[in-house]
């Protein structure tokens, strides 16, 4: 539900998998022909090379038709009729359990909110996904892109060395909520300034959200963001006071081991001289940059991890 940046890229990601089939897309503001155009041409992730067609009935990708719907009221979306068991709620509007009940009334069995939620259970892959109970959880949140980057990193460090306190800064690429030129933004004055002309300090709930998925870190971690004028890919700076003294090499060894073991495919690790554009379309939730981090003392360390905030 919703075919903006997230909805469009969720569709791209499903085409790489054989165990997921998209049967319908609901967006009241986008007709099938335009939807096909949006899907095929992407300024960040490049042109989709398969065959894409669109008309008033839906879009067809490589011969597979996907029905398009245009319901404003989510209770009117016939998910059951089109055979949709799972709904990705990616409008950014319906982010509570109560609001997502509308999808269940329409015949869906499960709803995944593609954003943080005030009351839906929040799950981050590699961190607390083992707590998911299919019998109990029908509406869940997949948290935010930044939480998905930060939480795996924080989990490994906390499990191995203990985190006494930590501050996070995300240097975050521009997103659709920002303005191309200066404009009114009553709730966030700085957020109303032109995205391409400024580095904009901003708030983020990502660090506090980590306390929801890693309860032992609740109250020990907070953070903020700098919005910067790049199209995509962001980076987390996690500065920690550790419970146990450690060498920087020991911390990197623990993170590398996790990236090759229990968090493989979720947490990445690199010792290359990388920059942000190297992570466009990277599916990892978080990639530790071993060369970018620094340590001041055995209990005071800054860790750096990259993420494609649209695709990871």
Curated annotation (Swiss-Prot):
The keyword Oxidoreductase applies. Induction: Induced by sugar addition. The active site is at 145 (nucleophile). The record marks 172 as: Activates thiol group during catalysis. One of its GO terms (cellular component) is cytosol. Its EC number is 1.2.1.12. It catalyses: D-glyceraldehyde 3-phosphate + phosphate + NAD(+) = (2R)-3-phospho-glyceroyl phosphate + NADH + H(+). Keywords: Cytoplasm, Glycolysis, NAD, Oxidoreductase. This is Glyceraldehyde-3-phosphate dehydrogenase, cytosolic. It comes from Scenedesmus vacuolatus (Green alga).
